[in-house]
């Protein structure tokens, strides 16, 4: 009589031969216990010994005999509540055609524009990363008032970015952070050393995922272009392990729709689907999401077109803006300038809060932020900051508004619609309306409004 225990069984689908070998070795075992903290994959390779049943849409999904998810563990005090501090901002870059582009991270833009704005935000040379790392370090200082050995982790896309982020943190804190690179033979020892110390920061290239245990990590910066649900869940899993009741975790991330959707769905239980759902955000057969595919294609196109045009993608400038706090499926707070009193209200949240206290405290901070905004609007508060108004109009609505205004102006002047659009494009810069960002369309809306009046 044999009991076989398979831990992290989702890896059994990593290759056909791997899965076949597992089946051949253990198919006739009397009992099998399959365990995993992430019971899904970024592809459709079946996981050995897992039962799949069709859902309402006919998609075959995995079925567990027993599930203990994040939501239940949170209520039991086994894991920490995670607050996501989302940052938007203004981005400018040169595309592979030599066209200078600008867009707001968090605006309703096309997916390729969002991917390029996201890429610009993650540039170590830009202000966005400097401002977000500074905010994250302030948050870590606040958490360490209650949890003296709390540590922070920056998750980078590649080695070059990781080195850049490490240099930024050294400049901000005066202390060089632990740098973990996948090709470094001493990486595992360095992670263990960091785990046992009270150092503030560690920077790693994606490799800090499952199997890496650093319980004191309490603040994270998600500075990678990866947006697969599996990687996101494993990355956030580095911050949720509770050592004592009341510890919280804070993760800073860019306001990218795919990431904010994953943050909102943190407490939802996911299963592995053997069939692809027909939606735009589904992961592709190679495990990449549409956002990641666009990012990769943009980088490949940049390299190919450089020889033909002499241009390549170049981040020009970036500036961060506090957007909101995401917690327990809800949004808290309002857009605010970096360094403002409103942002500090959230960076200064206590490091020790029970799950049922977090939402109440966030609501109190949002109400206080509203009072600060009102006081600034009345002129009763002059703190050197302006009140940031969020963008409510969608890209489709902006295009519709621009076309309506162009129609009005064309009737007034007798010009053709196309002629007016061409003049606006020459005056404001940027590509045709179909490829223009929300910010570029807004500039044209503002100009045609001035002409109408």
What name fits each language-model region?
Residues 150-157:
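Conserved RecA-like ASCE P-loop NTPase motor core of nucleic-acid helicases/translocases
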Residues 1-34, 38-41:
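SF2 helicase catalytic motif II
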């Amino acid at each position: 009589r044999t009991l076989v225990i398979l831990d992290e069984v989702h890896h059994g689908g990593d290759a056909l031969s791997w899965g076949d070998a597992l089946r051949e070795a253990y198919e006739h075992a009397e009992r099998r216990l399959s365990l995993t903290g992430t019971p899904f994959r970024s592809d459709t390779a079946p996981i050995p010994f897992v039962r799949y049943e069709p859902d309402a849409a006919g998609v075959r999904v995995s079925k567990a005999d027993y599930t203990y998810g994040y939501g239940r563990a949170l209520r039991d005090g086994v894991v920490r509540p995670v607050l996501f501090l989302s940052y938007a901002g203004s981005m400018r870059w040169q595309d592979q055609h030599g066209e200078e582009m600008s867009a707001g991270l968090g605006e309703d833009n096309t997916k390729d524009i969002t991917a390029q704005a996201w890429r610009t935000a993650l540039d170590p040379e830009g202000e966005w990363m400097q401002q977000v790392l500074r905010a994250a370090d302030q948050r870590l200082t606040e958490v360490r008032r209650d949890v003296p050995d709390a540590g922070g982790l920056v998750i980078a896309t590649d080695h070059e970015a990781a080195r850049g982020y490490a240099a930024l943190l050294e400049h901000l804190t005066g202390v060089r952070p632990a740098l973990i690179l996948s090709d470094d033979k001493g990486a595992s020892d360095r992670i263990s050393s960091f785990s046992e110390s009270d150092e503030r920061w560690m920077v790693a290239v994606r490799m800090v995922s499952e199997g890496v245990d650093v319980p004191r990590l309490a603040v994270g910066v998600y500075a990678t272009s990866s947006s697969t649900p599996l990687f996101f869940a494993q990355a956030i899993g580095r911050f949720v392990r509770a050592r004592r009741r009341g510890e919280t975790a804070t993760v800073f991330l860019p306001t990218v729709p795919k990431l904010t959707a994953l943050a909102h769905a943190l407490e939802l239980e996911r299963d592995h689907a053997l069939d692809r759902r027909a939606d735009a955000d589904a992961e592709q057969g190679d495990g990449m999401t549409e956002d990641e595919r666009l990012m990769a294609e943009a980088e490949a196109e940049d390299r190919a077109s450089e020889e033909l045009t002499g241009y390549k993608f170049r981040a020009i400038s970036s500036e961060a803006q506090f957007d909101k706090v995401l917690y327990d499926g809800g949004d808290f707070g309002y857009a605010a300038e970096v360094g403002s009193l409103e942002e500090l209200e959230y960076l200064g949240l206590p490091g020790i809060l029970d799950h049922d206290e977090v939402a109440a405290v966030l609501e109190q901070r949002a109400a206080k932020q509203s009072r600060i905004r009102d006081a600034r609007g009345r002129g009763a508060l002059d703190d050197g900051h302006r009140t940031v108004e969020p963008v409510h109009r969608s890209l489709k609505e902006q295009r519709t508004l621009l076309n309506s205004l162009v129609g009005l102006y064309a009737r007034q002047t007798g010009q053709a619609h196309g002629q007016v659009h061409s003049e606006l494009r020459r005056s404001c810069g940027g590509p045709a309306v179909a490829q223009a960002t929300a910010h570029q369309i807004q500039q044209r809306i503002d100009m045609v409004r001035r002409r109408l009046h």
